[in-house]
């Protein structure tokens, strides 16, 4: 399944015009730049609106809260990473090492901008039911990243789907643990490799 465009609205909402899509991209770029510089607290909706050159009311029509906005930023980051890995896929013949390699590369991409990673993960942690559709899209993008790394033809088996869910949870937990200083980079890598080995189970 190809990833959705970062400018695409959530499923069930009307398609954006070209002008609306460009406005949404500007908003996401502005939020990303603020998060890179100062993390979650630096992303203030008024500053995002000013940087994106949109009215504050317009910003809230696109993203009802900062949490909605930063979850959308995370989706955009995952989609960009997905495209990069599709162009440069892992080369191992077995699925478990391919998945471990993919998630390790994803972790390193987030590691390069720790304040942005902190902002996105905090937004996911704060998300309530009103952000459910956006969180589901992030989860689907993460799951698709893992499924693509498995690299098989045809739909995944039920055991593979179960393994992907556990691997996805491990990935998120490892990222939170690293951001909070409870896990080292080496421990994150080890956890990702351990979780990926679930794919070898019958």
Indicate where each model-derived feature is located:
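N-terminal intrinsically disordered/low-complexity leader segments
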Residues: 1-22
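Short hydrophobic clusters on alpha-helical segments that form packing/core surfaces
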Residues: 27-35, 77, 106, 171
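Alpha-helical DNA-contacting segments of helix-turn-helix folds
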Residues: 70-77, 134
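Hydrophobic alpha-helical connector segments
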Residues: 72, 83-112, 164-167, 189
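Short, hydrophobic secondary-structure boundary micro-motifs
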Residues: 44, 117-121, 132, 158, ...
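Helix-turn-helix
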Residues: 26, 34-68, 72
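Amphipathic alpha-helical packing segments from all-alpha helical-bundle domains
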Residues: 79-82, 128-154, 158-172, 190-198
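Amphipathic alpha-helical segments used for helix-helix packing
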Residues: 109-130, 147, 173-176
């Amino acid at each position: 399944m190809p990833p959705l465009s970062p400018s695409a609205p959530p499923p069930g909402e009307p398609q954006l015009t070209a002008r609306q899509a460009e406005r949404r991209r500007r908003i996401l770029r502005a939020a990303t730049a603020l998060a890179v510089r100062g993390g979650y607290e630096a992303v203030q909706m008024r500053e995002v609106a000013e940087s994106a050159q949109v009215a504050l009311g317009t910003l809230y029509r696109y993203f009802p809260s900062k949490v909605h906005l930063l979850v959308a930023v995370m989706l955009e980051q995952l989609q960009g990473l997905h495209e990069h890995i599709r162009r440069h896929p892992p080369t191992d013949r077995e699925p478990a090492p391919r998945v471990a390699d993919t998630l390790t590369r994803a972790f390193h991409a987030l590691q390069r901008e720790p304040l942005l990673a902190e902002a996105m993960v905090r937004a996911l942690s704060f998300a309530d039911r009103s952000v459910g559709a956006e969180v589901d899209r992030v989860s689907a993008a993460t799951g698709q990243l893992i499924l693509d790394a498995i690299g098989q033809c045809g739909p995944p088996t039920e055991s593979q789907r179960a393994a992907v869910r556990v691997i996805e949870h491990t990935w998120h937990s490892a990222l939170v643990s690293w951001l909070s200083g409870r896990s080292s980079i080496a421990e994150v890598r080890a956890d990702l490799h351990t979780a990926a080995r679930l794919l070898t189970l019958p």
